[in-house]
């Protein structure tokens, strides 16, 4: 039996499903977290063979001792993962210290965590990147801006999501940013990039031990997460019904360039919505950033709804067996609509639930830790056509206050982007465009599942 340590299995709240599928596949699933055992969801308790509570996951020594305890009790650890961006460096440090070779090591972290380091590997994959400058002083930043023009985007070189990301449109905003950085984050390295006029398209895939995708999907974020966070706006994004071929090719090329194996990945690309001389034409793919973990929040569930499948199982099967026999069924659009508290919406929650009762798959309050980028009240639904999805967005997000006309116009402008306008992806001729094409799912022989008992440690 293989031993799998899952770091922070209780957050995000849907991650217990990864543990359940691992256990169903006969893995010995060992959780380490800082939530008291009695407060864990019953489903998570049932999905773990044992749980070790630490005082704080931020305390490396405590987590180190927890891993050492599991090794003493169960022997060699085969896998250690959190599937969580926040803990990727911690995961790598633990693997390195305990010689767990099934995932990234500490030496791998710069290229997958630092946005400036990612660009080299994107270029190796033959994919265009935005020009950038490592933030130094006013003169250095202004020299870069003289080349690319305003606006520019600044963010931590090693950051999570859109946290502390800002669009600067003039010299005064630049000076304000530099002053705030000097006062609050003098030791944090920031990257400045030219602004890309685009929507975000993602490549979401489960990659096997040979670096081949066994499942592929993608989402579209027509609204900038940076703007959603900074403007306290509603949130929309959706799983696209069919993954565009240029996104697929770009995703596979990046998998190869970064040397990804045995992971669930979420790669983000800009799809340009207008021509930009420095990067290319409308519809072209431009690199944004790699995330060596599943897309955040409830997106794995949305992918399940959009593909009539179970990505938690596909991932667990990849870990346990190297492949999966989980089928992929009918494809749908799966939109996420996140309402922001404090807005006056035309349709009440009850009216939305009544009108879309046959379509809605999930309704919930967003955890505070995720609400900045996702809103406060979420609705997830499925639709066969884009027109149905657009009407859903118009109904859920329509407001009654004085800004109603402007809000509706902005939403209409976003939805008017329509299906991604694709361009043929041209890669460098000395680099193959991707790994060998695969079907959406790789078959494996049926394996017997070993039943295991549940143990807990408070």
Where are the language model's segments positioned?
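Peripheral (often C-terminal) accessory segments that flank ATP-dependent C-N-forming ligase machineries
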Residues: 316-458
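CheY-like receiver
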Residues: 66-70, 143-144, 177-180
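A conserved helix-loop-beta module that forms one wall/lid of the active-site cleft
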Residues: 95-164
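Short, well-ordered beta-strand elements within core beta-sheets of diverse protein domains
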Residues: 166, 194, 239, 377-383
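ATP-binding N-terminal substructure of ATP-dependent carboxylate-amine bond-forming enzymes
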Residues: 1-107, 139, 394-411, 415-438, ...
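Conserved ATP-binding module of the ATP-grasp superfamily
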Residues: 128-130, 151-154, 165-202, 227-235, ...
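ATP-dependent carboxylate/phosphate-activation module, predominantly the ATP-grasp catalytic core
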Residues: 194-260, 264, 271, 275, ...
